[in-house]
């Protein structure tokens, strides 16, 4: 009888650790009914080397974070193994991405899904406060996959309507097409939906950190795919609010382009901003009176988007009455969150609102973020958000003359913070 080699045993253990511990922290869902419906996940994580290695890398990153200072030898082992798998993941991901253009049809679509899984794992690794790397290169690579993802989803819809939720379960009908090589299996289709939603979430929320260079239209194209993107299920925020973030980002890009050519019309700027503000108002009026957690989270996003919009129009000036009005409105909504765990879904609103907070409101953000950090473990940048806020407040005090932009505030030691 032949047994696997010791390293294979270790890798299997790390993979189980990722599934049991890291994945729930990486993809915290505000809807507990969705938890556990990830039957497609193991297939995708083990289907190609780059995704597999990137997953092991994430597992080791989290193990390293839990090591105490008195166990330095253990920390060194986690760090050594993490670096080993990180290098392998980078090498294999380049091979995978480079080979996609040489494939066609269902093979290319499957390869694209696996490549997206790898890119998202690498983004998760680099953007974590535990590593603080440059996640932008991996997001850029993931964005190039959007056309194939959209085409694949369109093809999948021809076989019938999709499941109502992105958190779907294996059905008896899936066994009828087990040998079908012309369409996506349950596992690949489930991964395509979930990973596309994750890309949309990360991509849209990254726009404020990336600035006008962000591919707003690409993320809008993802949102336009019928039934594909349901951000309420991965973030707790409805699609329309995320679409509005893109619209504000595009307005910011347009304004800067017009300023560069000395042709900015304040009248046109005000009109375009009013259209976006009316969009927010109209959608908020449609929210039901019996508020659910996703409704509250969406309302929080809408209020903070108003702050974002005001600063794009008038500059990053916390002293403006309209800015403070939206900041106060957002804080009142944040105070209605049922528990600290819900903070996981509102990192972006906390950062945007906090950057423009008045002196009297700073302690609210400090206590909220510190309480979350002390209560929950996460791979996300919650401590990074507080550092961003503290830096933003200092910049406001020190430099009141130079015009500040959002990507300047989101910069932390030369690298942008990813708010997701």
Swiss-Prot record:
Its main location: nucleus. The keyword Transferase does not apply. The keyword Nucleus applies. One of its GO terms (molecular function) is transcription cis-regulatory region binding. Transmembrane segments: none annotated. Keywords: Nucleus. It is found in: Nucleus. It comes from the Eukaryota. InterPro entries: Fun_TF. Disulfide bonds: none annotated. Pfam families: Fungal_trans_2. GO terms for cellular component: nucleus. GO terms for biological process: positive regulation of transcription by RNA polymerase II. Belongs to the TRI10 transcription regulator family. Transcriptional activator of all of the trichothecene biosynthesis genes. Acts upstream of the cluster-encoded transcription factor TRI6 and is necessary for full expression of both the other trichothecene genes and the genes for the primary metabolic pathway that precedes the trichothecene biosynthetic pathway. This is Trichothecene biosynthesis transcription regulator TRI10. The lineage of its organism: Eukaryota, Fungi, Dikarya, Ascomycota, Pezizomycotina.
């Amino acid at each position: 009888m032949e047994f696997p080699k010791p390293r294979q045993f270790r890798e299997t253990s790390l993979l189980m650790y990722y599934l049991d511990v890291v994945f729930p922290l990486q993809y915290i869902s505000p809807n507990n009914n969705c938890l556990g419906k990830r039957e497609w996940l193991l297939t995708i994580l083990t289907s190609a080397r780059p995704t597999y290695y990137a997953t092991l890398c994430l597992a080791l990153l989290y193990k390293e974070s839990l090591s105490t200072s008195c166990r330095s030898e253990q920390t060194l082992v986690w760090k050594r193994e993490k670096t080993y798998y990180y290098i392998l993941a980078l090498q294999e991901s380049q091979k995978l991405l480079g080979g996609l253009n040489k494939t066609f049809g269902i093979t290319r679509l499957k390869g694209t899904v696996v490549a997206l899984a790898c890119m998202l794992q690498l983004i998760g690794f680099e953007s974590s406060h535990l590593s603080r790397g440059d996640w932008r290169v991996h997001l850029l690579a993931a964005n190039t996959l959007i056309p194939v993802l959209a085409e694949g989803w369109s093809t999948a819809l021809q076989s019938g309507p999709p499941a109502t939720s992105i958190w779907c379960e294996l059905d008896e009908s899936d066994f009828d097409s087990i040998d079908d090589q012309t369409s996506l299996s349950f596992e690949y289709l489930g991964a395509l939906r979930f990973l596309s939603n994750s890309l949309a979430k990360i991509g849209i929320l990254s726009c404020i950190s990336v600035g006008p260079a962000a591919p707003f239209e690409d993320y809008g194209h993802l949102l336009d795919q019928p039934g594909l993107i349901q951000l309420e299920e991965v973030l707790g925020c409805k699609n329309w609010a995320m679409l509005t973030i893109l619209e504000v980002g595009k307005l910011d890009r347009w304004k800067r382009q017009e300023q560069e050519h000395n042709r900015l019309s304040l009248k046109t700027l005000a009109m375009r901003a009013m259209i976006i503000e009316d969009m927010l108002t109209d959608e908020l009026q449609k929210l039901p009176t019996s508020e659910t957690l996703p409704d509250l989270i969406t309302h929080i996003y809408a209020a903070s988007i108003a702050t974002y919009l005001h600063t794009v129009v008038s500059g990053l000036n916390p002293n403006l009455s309209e800015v403070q009005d939206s900041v106060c409105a957002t804080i009142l909504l944040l105070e209605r969150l049922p528990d600290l765990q819900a903070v996981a879904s509102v990192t972006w609103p906390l950062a945007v609102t906090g950057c423009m907070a008045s002196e009297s409101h700073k302690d609210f953000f400090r206590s909220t973020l510190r309480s979350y950090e002390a209560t929950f473990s996460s791979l996300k940048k919650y401590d990074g958000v507080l550092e961003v806020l503290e830096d933003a407040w200092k910049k406001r005090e020190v430099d009141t003359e130079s015009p500040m932009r959002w990507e300047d505030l989101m910069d932390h030691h030369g690298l942008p913070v990813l708010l997701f």
